[in-house]
Each structure stands twice: as structure tokens, then as C-alpha cells.
Amino acid sequence: KQRLEALDIELPKPILLPVILLEDAQNIPVATTDSTPIIRRLEQEFSDRGAIPDNPALAFINYLLEDFADEWLTKYMFHYRWHFKEDADNAGTILPLVEFEKSLPVKEHKQIKQYITQRQTERLWVVGSSNETAELIDQSFKRFISMLNKHLIKSPFLLGDRPSSADFAFYGQLSQLVKFDPTPRKICHDFNLKLSVNL
């Protein structure tokens, strides 16, 4: 947010990750967010190295997997990051250092950590995360990781020998689940997830 404001570039609505600058029809940089429209735009501009399979059946499966990643893997990530105290403390401590100066005064860091943690934990209901649904989300994630691991043992990517837009969508969420948040990281390591080596 601060970087875009410093460049006098209008903030995207809503602010999601990733955010990249793409030029509009007048060659003015515009902050563009959400991987799906970004990939679709890049597909049009750089058609020689596409991330969407040429085969219509595979392209359809790719869209389904990409949508699953955007809608459901996000729920896993948000649930694990903010539902459990250890994970929320971890994220609340680190995220202010990503968005703000690394050398925040201790008091200011503590205030930002408290604000972010409270804001995000109060939004858990948006992704369907609660004490009542926690076990269901956990079982679903473990089932997903087990199936993904079996697939990745046979194939380096979701749809074959090269990455697709579905792989990129999976990567965004799985990089956090495998590397950043303590609870899902342990689950992935317990499953010996092949992907964790590649992230």
C-alpha cells in the first residue's frame, strides 16, 4: 500500500496478493490484483509461453483447479493462520515487518501486531472457520494434501510436465501453508509432502 501511494498509483480494490503494475491503454501503470486476471492478461500479451493448456479438456480441468485454489485453498490458509493461537501469534509478529519498516519500534510493532491479529481473527467467519468447523477443515486439508502428494510423486506439475495457471494458484497458498504457518507446515511435513521440497 505504501509503495503504491509513494508512486502516486491508485490502490486496487480490493487489495489482494499478488499486486503487479500493468499498463493501461494510455500506457499508465495500474495496480492490478488477483492472479487469475493477471494471468489472463499475460496470456494475451505473451501467447508463445502460455500457462493455460491448449487442449480444451485440460484447459477446463485447469480452470477448475485454479478456482479450487483461489476459493478453497485460501480457506485452508486463512483458517490455519488465524484460528490457532500459535499460528496467529506467528503471523501477527511477522506480517507487520513485511508491510512496514523492518526496524519498527517495539511499542509500535506490538500495536500493529495486535491490530492485525484482532482484525484477521474477527474475519475467520468469512471463510467459514470456527470452532465448529475446525475439524472438518483440518480433515479436508489432510485429504487434499494426501491426494496432492500421491499425484506429485507421479507428475512434476498438476497437468503434466510444465506448470499451468492452476500450479501458480496452488503455489500461492501452499507456499504459505508449507513454509510460513506452524500448524499446516507440521501437517505437510508429517505427510512428507513432495511439494515442500520444491517450494
Q: How should these model regions be labeled?
A:
Residues 75-199:
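GST-like fold's C-terminal all-alpha helical module
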Residues 1-107, 158:
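GST-like domain detector, emphasizing the conserved glutathione-binding G-site
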